[in-house]
């Protein structure tokens, strides 16, 4: 297997990517293709499932061929994906019955409110580790069954399949043979009991979702099957699956209880490994399965921030104060602070630990002296503030004081943001040499399943430091800024709640 590589497929919210990794965990090749975001109505977000598949298959082939290799050089494929995004398709034709409803989509918020009013939140959280929220897959499936003509009848007849994006990719890679998912993706549906690790019949009944639609649930690291498509001439083992944040936690080698990572992508996703026992959150965090390797199941606490890097995209595309996302660091660094300006980027509601679906983006503290640079700095700062809110909740739930924060994702390359994050936290923000930890985690899971890497210790030894950011801001300054942020969040919530 010396000259073979692991192919990681990273199907994200805005693009499909593929990366080849060698035995040392180095990236040998990358291919990426963006795809269309569909916004049929305010608060609705969709993708075309066929475009998800075509772009992912395309970059998989491209990543391999651009290095002069072919399918025989691939030892295994690992898949990681945007979670919760919901696809329902016809088992016979393989055609989706509706567009993919994306994790950011809020169309089922009212239905979620009605479930909460029935007093079901405690039951759902006890079983799934999740709050009732339109973010998760369950109510999206229900919406498709209720709103696509003929869908419910077909589902009752066993003719429809539901899958998160990983399931859809495996289904297509195996020419409609395998309908599977892994425990991490299943744990994000609001239908999966994280204690028994089975689909929960009571929740399925409650939401009127037929069991026959659901995929078989597997470990995150095992050989599920082999590719059968024309993308590769040879049969390649599909051997690792994990939702993007779980894969990043693994890629960051947060393999012991109390270790935390933050992935700064479109949103921010913080996850803490809590070991082999699920901790029920008292602070509006999500309890989830970190991964399963063999019979070993690790659990995690997670806080999701809906808008992180997306606030930079908004400054570029919506407001036009920067032309490229890369410009923001220099613009923000041109002022020493925001001059009292706070931006609460609740464009799609507030995520953890607030979970307020109706809050909207707000800017406070604006004066005639406020400039584009102040707005840019406030936008970057908002990413760090939101992360701090989640980390404080994690410490409260777990009883563990965080020793350091491992960072990755696109915005972790922003030194100004990383330094401010360390200042707010009062602990080091630690950036690894390979920040593509999501894809790396998927590669590790697949490689371990086929013996490409011997064991966890071999994989753990590959993690290498790029830079450590240590706190340097005086405590009084930190407290003053945090108080301003908390005031801004309270004001954003008040605006959302005042609908008289």
Swiss-Prot record:
Activity modulation: Inhibited by fructose 1,6-bisphosphate (FBP).
Please give the Pfam families that the UniProt record associates with this protein: FGGY_C, FGGY_N
GO MF annotations in UniProt: ATP binding; glycerol kinase activity
Which parts of the sequence bind ATP? 13-15, 266, 309, 313, 410
Which residues make up the binding site for glycerol? 83-84, 135, 244-245
UniProt: ADP binding residues: 13, 17, 266, 309, 410, 414
SUPFAM superfamilies, per the entry:
Actin-like ATPase domain
Give GO BP annotations, semicolon-separated: glycerol catabolic process; glycerol metabolic process; glycerol-3-phosphate metabolic process
**Pathway in which this enzyme or protein is active:** Polyol metabolism; glycerol degradation via glycerol kinase pathway; sn-glycerol 3-phosphate from glycerol: step 1/1
Q: Which reaction does it catalyse?
A: glycerol + ATP = sn-glycerol 3-phosphate + ADP + H(+)
* Protein origin, superkingdom: Bacteria
Class in the EC hierarchy, top level: transferase
Q: EC annotation?
A: 2.7.1.30
Q: Where does sn-glycerol 3-phosphate bind?
A: 13, 83-84, 135, 244
Kindly give the InterPro entries that the UniProt entry links to this protein.
ATPase_NBD, Carb_kinase_FGGY, Carb_kinase_FGGY_CS, FGGY_C, FGGY_N, Glycerol_kin
Cellular component annotations (GO), alphabetically ordered: cytosol
Alphabetized, the UniProt keywords read:
ATP-binding, Glycerol metabolism, Kinase, Nucleotide-binding, Transferase
Cross-referenced NCBIfam families: glycerol_kin, PRK00047.1
Q: What does this protein do?
A: Key enzyme in the regulation of glycerol uptake and metabolism. Catalyzes the phosphorylation of glycerol to yield sn-glycerol 3-phosphate.
HAMAP family found in the cross-reference section: Glycerol_kin
The family note in this entry says: Belongs to the FGGY kinase family.
Q: Identify this protein by name.
A: Glycerol kinase
Q: Which organism is it from?
A: Burkholderia ambifaria (strain MC40-6)
């Amino acid at each position: 297997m010396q000259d073979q590589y692991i192919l990681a497929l990273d199907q994200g919210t805005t693009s499909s990517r593929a990366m080849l990794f060698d035995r040392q965990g180095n990236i040998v090749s990358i291919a990426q293709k963006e795809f269309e975001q569909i916004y049929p109505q305010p608060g609705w977000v969709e993708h075309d499932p066929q475009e998800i598949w075509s772009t992912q298959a395309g970059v998989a082939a491209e990543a391999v061929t651009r290095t002069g290799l072919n399918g025989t050089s691939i030892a295994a494929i690992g898949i990681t994906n945007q979670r919760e995004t919901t696809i329902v398709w016809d088992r016979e034709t393989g055609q989706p019955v509706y567009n993919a409803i994306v994790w950011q989509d809020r169309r089922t918020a009212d239905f979620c409110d009605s479930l909460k009013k029935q007093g079901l939140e405690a039951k759902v959280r006890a079983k799934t580790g999740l709050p009732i929220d339109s973010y998760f897959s369950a109510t999206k499936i229900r919406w498709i069954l209720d709103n696509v003509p003929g869908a419910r009848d077909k589902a009752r007849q066993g003719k429809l399949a539901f899958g998160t994006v990983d399931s859809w990719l495996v289904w297509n890679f195996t020419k409609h043979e395998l309908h599977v998912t892994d425990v991490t993706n299943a744990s994000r549906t609001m239908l999966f009991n994280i204690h028994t690790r089975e689909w929960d019949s009571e929740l399925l009944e409650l939401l009127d979702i037929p069991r026959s639609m659901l995929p078989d649930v597997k470990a995150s690291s095992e050989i599920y099957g082999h590719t059968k498509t024309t993308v590769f001439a040879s049969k390649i083992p599909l051997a690792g699956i994990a939702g993007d944040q779980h894969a990043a936690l693994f890629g960051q080698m947060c393999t012991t209880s109390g270790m935390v990572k933050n992935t700064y992508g479109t949103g921010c996703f913080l996850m803490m490994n809590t070991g082999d026992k699920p901790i029920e959150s008292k602070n509006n965090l999500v309890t989830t399965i970190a991964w399963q390797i063999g019979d070993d199941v690790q659990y995690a606490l997670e806080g999701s921030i809906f808008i992180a890097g997306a606030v930079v995209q908004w400054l570029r595309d919506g407001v036009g104060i920067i032309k490229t996302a890369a410009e923001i660091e220099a613009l923000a660094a041109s002022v020493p602070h925001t001059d009292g300006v706070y931006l609460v980027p609740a464009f799609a509601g507030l995520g953890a630990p607030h979970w307020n679906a109706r809050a909207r983006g707000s800017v406070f503290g604006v004066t005639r002296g406020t400039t584009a640079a102040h707005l840019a700095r406030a936008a970057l700062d908002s990413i760090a503030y939101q992360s701090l809110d989640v980390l404080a909740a994690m410490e409260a739930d777990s009883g563990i004081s965080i020793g350091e924060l491992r960072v990755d994702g696109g915005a972790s390359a922003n030194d100004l943001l990383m330094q401010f994050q360390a200042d707010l936290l009062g602990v080091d923000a630690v950036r690894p040499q390979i920040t593509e930890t999501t894809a790396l985690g998927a590669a590790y899971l697949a490689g371990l399943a086929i013996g490409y890497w011997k064991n966890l210790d071999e994989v753990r030894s590959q993690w290498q430091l790029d830079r450590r950011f240590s706190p340097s801001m005086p405590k009084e300054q930190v407290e003053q800024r945090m108080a301003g942020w908390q005031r801004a969040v309270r004001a954003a919530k008040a605006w959302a709640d005042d609908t008289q």
